[in-house]
């Protein structure tokens, strides 16, 4: 598809631009904060809260995925909140459960005005500490052609990430 002013052109067909909007990113992450009652080792019941990051297309899909994943091990599950996340990319090394949010800033040229502007990108990286998260984020971005800086790295409360899984058609085995 080629964008031409206020129309979209696909082969010989011309469509109004509003009718053919595409999402800015294929990955859309949501924060889901849930609370539940958990029995402690001493037999007492304690209310706990956990935050999850879910790669989903909607709030409804986010809720369904968390219920499917977490509901197996927890009975009374309550949603405290579901919100859009600014995270645009997840980099997992699989060696730790700590997740850090890295703010990456790079300069870009605005195609409309031709002026230079700063663009912010948020990347989630798992690491053992802030320094390792910074190094891993920097290593992940080393092939980026424009200069960038990482002004902020902070630990998050995310305990699990549920990436999108393509549904398996009926009659096929999942690998």
Residue ranges and their predicted role:
Residues 1, 58-71, 129-145:
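A short, charged, amphipathic alpha-helix used as a generic interaction element across diverse proteins
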Residues 79-145:
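Short, solvent-exposed interaction modules
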Residues 46, 60-63, 70-75, 115-119:
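Acidic, Ser/Thr- and Gly-enriched intrinsically disordered low-complexity segments
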Residues 121-175:
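Structured core of small recognition/catalytic domains
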Residues 4, 9, 14-16, 21-30, ...:
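Intrinsic disorder/low-complexity detector
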Residues 38-54, 115-123, 145:
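A cross-kingdom feature marking solvent-exposed beta-strand/loop segments within repeated
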Residues 28, 35-40:
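Hydrophobic membrane-targeting and insertion signals
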């Amino acid at each position: 598809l080629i964008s031409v002013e206020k129309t979209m052109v696909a082969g010989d067909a011309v469509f109004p631009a509003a009718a053919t909007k595409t999402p800015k990113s294929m990955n859309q992450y949501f924060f889901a904060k849930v609370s539940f009652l958990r029995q402690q080792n001493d037999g007492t019941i304690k209310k706990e809260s956990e935050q999850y990051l879910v790669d989903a297309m909607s709030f409804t899909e986010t809720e369904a995925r968390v219920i499917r994943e977490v509901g197996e091990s927890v009975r009374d599950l309550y949603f405290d909140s579901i919100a859009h996340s600014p995270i645009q990319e997840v980099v997992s090394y699989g060696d730790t459960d700590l997740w850090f949010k890295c703010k990456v800033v790079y300069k870009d040229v605005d195609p409309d005005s031709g002026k230079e502007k700063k663009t912010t990108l948020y990347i989630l990286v798992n690491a053992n500490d802030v320094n390792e998260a910074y190094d891993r984020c920097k290593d992940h971005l080393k092939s980026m052609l424009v200069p960038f800086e990482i002004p902020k790295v902070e630990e998050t409360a995310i305990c699990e990430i549920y990436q999108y899984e393509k549904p398996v058609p009926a009659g096929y085995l999942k690998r």
